[in-house]
């Protein structure tokens, strides 16, 4: 009531209400509880761990940013702020887009490797002869034709149209055997000149050296508190204004300044440091 224009956002695992509101959790738990993990994996192994924190980042952080920005726009129209209760498990549940819609309407849950986009078709990763991987996402007819012609598998074009799992398993096996005949570098070179939705699985450092990301300015340098330059991944937001990239400070770097702003005296601050209550860097 004292600050009606205030926008206050909290991000927690399960939100401020509901039976799980006081329970601890991590990204893996939110993916499990939301249903995302129930179809993200292999029939042979079950659910797989994602290398990035989907619920934390794509779920919690991104939903929080969108909610705050939407609230800023609403406040400009109404003059009122609001409290935003962002739950990472809610946000993960909301990421069940196409599979969620079909499951609720058809009352049939997706399974591991049974759907178009989770391995049911030949949309998948394939190992090369030197134990690296290609991603093949040739779903549309033009890309399917381009892929199979390049692999010398035109005879399978008719079978592609038949989306029964047995048929698709056979096609995946044939493609897998074909990809295993050449090295990662050989396939990368060949498919770089072919528009078939096939890309190599790169390491982070390989991706950072890729001409596309370099030209798109996806790398930047930040200055740390000692004046050293640190290479970092840039934001994907295409702002045209010049950005000043500064690396974060070490834990405790501003402890004294913060406490002084709260009217703590030098002796009080020194006592807190000596007793280990706070850290100074």
Q: Which residue ranges define each predicted feature?
A:
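Active-site-adjacent "lid/gating" segments in soluble enzymes
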Residues: 1-134, 138
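Alpha-helical scaffold segments in soluble metabolic enzymes
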Residues: 63, 67-71, 146-150, 174, ...
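Beta-rich nucleic-acid/ligand-interaction surfaces
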Residues: 92, 167, 206-210, 280
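Aromatic-enriched alpha-helical interface/lid elements that frame and gate functional surfaces
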Residues: 122-194, 198
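A glycine-rich dinucleotide-binding beta-alpha-beta segment and adjacent secondary-structure elements
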Residues: 193-243
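Amphipathic terminal alpha-helices
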Residues: 209, 267-281
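Flexible, small-/acidic-enriched active-site or ligand-binding loops
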Residues: 223-273
């Amino acid at each position: 009531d004292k600050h009606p224009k205030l926008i206050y956002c909290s991000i927690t695992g399960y939100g401020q209400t509901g039976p799980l509101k006081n329970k601890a959790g991590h990204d893996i738990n939110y993916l499990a509880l939301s249903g995302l993990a129930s179809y993200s994996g292999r029939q042979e192994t079950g659910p797989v761990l994602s290398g990035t924190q989907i619920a934390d980042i794509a779920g919690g952080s991104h939903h929080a940013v969108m909610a705050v920005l939407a609230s800023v726009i609403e406040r400009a129209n109404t003059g009122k702020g609001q409290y935003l209760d962002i739950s990472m498990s809610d946000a993960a549940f909301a990421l069940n887009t196409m599979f969620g819609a079909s499951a609720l309407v058809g009352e049939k849950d997706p399974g591991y490797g049974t759907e178009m986009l989770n391995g049911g078709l030949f949309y998948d990763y394939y190992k090369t002869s030197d134990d690296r991987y290609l991603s093949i996402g040739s779903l549309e007819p033009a890309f399917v034709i381009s892929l199979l012609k390049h692999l010398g598998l035109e005879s399978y074009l008719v079978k592609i149209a038949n989306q029964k799992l047995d048929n698709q398993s056979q096609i995946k096996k044939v493609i897998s055997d074909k990809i295993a005949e050449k090295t990662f570098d050989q396939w990368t070179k060949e498919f770089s000149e072919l528009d078939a939705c096939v890309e190599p699985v790169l390491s982070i450092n390989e991706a950072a050296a890729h001409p596309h990301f370099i030209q798109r300015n996806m790398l930047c340098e930040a200055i740390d508190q000692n004046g050293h330059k640190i290479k970092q991944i840039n934001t994907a937001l295409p702002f045209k204004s010049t950005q000043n990239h500064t690396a974060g400070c070490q834990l405790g770097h501003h402890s004294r300044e913060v406490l002084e702003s709260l009217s703590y005296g030098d002796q009080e601050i020194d006592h807190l440091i000596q007793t280990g209550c706070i850290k100074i860097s």
